[in-house]
């Protein structure tokens, strides 16, 4: 009668046992006819190594084990084992016997383990999980980290032998179809799958309505239909839900099993104008995408943090969530239902395919799992099946083979699109393209779905903001009868960087604000876009990325630990008419050049136009040329990264030995001197250095989409540095410290009018004696090249009391 949940409690991980709560009969919780045991903590083995300074992260096979005593009283019950998600392959063993295998890391799966269990004894369960590359399982590659582990709940379920299905795609076996809905009435058809013959009683209730239906089970399925007059419709503003309680009785009328589901009543369509209509009202779909990872946790998030995400997206003013690039679990979808977010959901078919039957079969299985596990959710209004599938095609050097590959890929997309329509004819399908529309259109991808999603980053990866307008116009002329969504747009930004002179790839909040201030109004006003989803709600793990926040894609409106950025407040100000958010987005404190006071530490971000606030809340100012009575550099030019799209203002490398990467990713190269006119006294001078160039061509992030550094012919760098009258140092950063490593060099100097710097190799500084305040004395750092050009990344001058 009762459903029992026995949890895995011991994790065996790379030879190390990690224990959760010990098994205790007293910890069983009963709810109605059910009882369940608290689950072990969700886990990934990549929570930390995906962001460390070592390239790559662990991708391999690991084992979770548990021993579970199954009471003899369970001998007449059925047992199934359910896993919410394990990335990306899983092999289940019970008492040493192989039970089953599952491919795919983002959907739930379940196995009937009854034949393998020993009642009245301790049973040994082993779940082997691998996140190793497998050419037959999507995603093959992607701009996100493939965390390994059992990161959603796993449990052993005991039911009576007669029960609602636990093996049908790991659902509760009850499905609600609501294709006929209007203001005046709604028709709902309910199907319940069972393990055997019996009678099903269904109680549908909500919003003042209640009705009991009865149906007999035939061939493992019971079906009933009802009409609800004047239904309380579901929408983002009024997310009204109904419930259906399902009871299964045996032939003697004895209650055997009970489950419940929620559902919503709404109707929607994309109209003749290609806009989205919900319950007869035109709605512009606007919101974001979300990745399911969190700083220091990977993808093993507790429900509390997942709930916070969805509430923050709603509070931003969003009505739409693109659940990308994979299904994200029952709890997330329940939240979208209950607070009112329209959703698209997609399988992780990203970047490329493998031209094998096994790969295609796994794609189809993922579609089946996605649809069956999410079809009851009223929030889901779009099924999607691929993202940027031609972004990383093989055979680029062989035009004939490339063309054949593209045709094979298009065939797979057409097959998946047809399968989605067969699985669920009530929801439209979507394919998402990167900014290479001509190639997709040429091979027929644009005809392989009901909706076309466009990922456009004009003004970030290349071009200018106006490229968005031109691309949308081009696509709508080619597809006049196809609804279009702007499914991705965004600019990487680090909240620590602010500037009055924003430029592409400076990672400043201010450039990101410029970007979104063009894109969001365009989406809202465009008569050709049904909506848009900013990429992304949160900064997310992408191990191969090497920007201002290495190993993260930092296009999020909030940080990886969910601190809102100014871009979040900008969206809130527009979508919620919140003037407070608008003021927050407009705030930028200007720091003006002025004579340096003895008590004011001077911190300069060389080669940069940005203010940088470090983790200790110390502000580093942008560089300036030397001015009499103040401070600044003499000679040189800002370091720039040369790409096929032009020169960018910062190196795209992971700076080792620091989290303040932006300080070291910019620099002034060819610098001759740095001078500050200071009151007499003792100062600590810290030169921050890092070598940003190498003689060999580095393998940079493939996701910078053409913004990878080009070879500069760099042959090395060696320089002599002298601080005031201290002995000079000869520095070769690569030989002495290694490339891309933060090197702080600290000096202590005393300055007084009688202690002017002197060096036969000193550069010729501007004569400022006439304008220098009489109570200041120059502090100088002099640079002389031995080979290559001198470099200075950042500098501190700190008065010593």
Please state what every model-predicted region is.
Residues 22-52, 116-185, 192, 259-267, ...:
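An acidic-aromatic loop/edge-strand motif
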Residues 30-31, 59-167, 196-197, 341-344, ...:
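Accessory beta-strand-rich segments of carbohydrate-active enzymes
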Residues 64-66, 107-111, 220-226, 672-676, ...:
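Short strand-edge motifs at loop-to-beta-strand transitions and within beta-strands
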Residues 118-120, 191-271:
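Extended acidic/polar, glycine-enriched regions
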Residues 587-760, 767, 771-801:
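Compositionally biased, intrinsically disordered or flexible polar/acidic segments
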Residues 23, 30-32, 59, 86, ...:
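Substrate-binding clefts and catalytic carboxylate motifs of secreted carbohydrate-active enzymes
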Residues 106-110, 114, 124, 135-138, ...:
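Active-site mouth of glycoside hydrolases
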